[in-house]
């Protein structure tokens, strides 16, 4: 570990769009703050700062950036302090150093630097959709595509479903497995890869990933949903909403949640007899 690290603070009214672009530029550690976000890395973030400023100019967005060099020992503690519990639907998501809350299904997530802790709109919406529509009476087995920290997989498992999970990032698979262990959960199967490596069909398929990948995998996502099963899609910017609705128009749209510039959908794969 290096003695110093770079911290880039970005403020903008279009912080969600800029944050997504920051990931495309190679950012791995992002902390959300009011009206913006903070990037941290042991490598110089000057190029990412420049790229964000250029992108903001092209889309007509305001932006304010500040880059500092800090001691590594400080930012680890600051990062922990910045991660607070959050409730979404039936679930209460907390880091292990916080207490659980009565009346909620408890989920412990100690977030890795690149993966979710439940605070983002897309994750929160997924948890709300799972809370409202997914139950053991209808659903027995689920697949989480792009599992990240494993938060959605763990939520489904806490409801009693057998869960498969996958991610193209090996570190995400390790993070999900570790978080599952902390929650007393064991996945039915977890692998490094995507839905194209899945066998069989599921009562619930969840994909909280970027819009382009959802569209690319649209046929595979639909193919792996059982008759009368559910498909939950999230991580979608509003500008892609119409394209998503068109690509999945052969499924029944059950509900759509919009939070700021993020869209989440739950579809049902009605069987041929409409039962």
UniProtKB/Swiss-Prot annotation:
Reactions it catalyzes: L-lysyl-[protein] + 3 S-adenosyl-L-methionine = N(6),N(6),N(6)-trimethyl-L-lysyl-[protein] + 3 S-adenosyl-L-homocysteine + 3 H(+)
Question: Would you tell me the Gene Ontology cellular component terms?
Answer: cytoplasm
Q: List the disulfide bonds.
A: none
Entry GO MF terms: protein-lysine N-methyltransferase activity
Keywords linked to the UniProt accession: Cytoplasm, Methyltransferase, S-adenosyl-L-methionine, Transferase
User: Which terms under GO biological process does the entry name?
Assistant: methylation
Gene3D superfamilies linked to this entry: Vaccinia Virus protein VP39 (3.40.50.150)
Compartment(s) where it occurs, according to its Swiss-Prot or TrEMBL record? Cytoplasm
What is the E.C. number? 2.1.1.-
Q: Which residues bind S-adenosyl-L-methionine?
A: 123, 146, 167, 208
Pfam family, any one: PrmA
* Class in the EC hierarchy, top level: transferase
Give the protein's function. Methylates ribosomal protein L11.
Family that this chain belongs to: Belongs to the methyltransferase superfamily. PrmA family.
The protein's name is Ribosomal protein L11 methyltransferase
The gene that this protein is the product of is: prmA
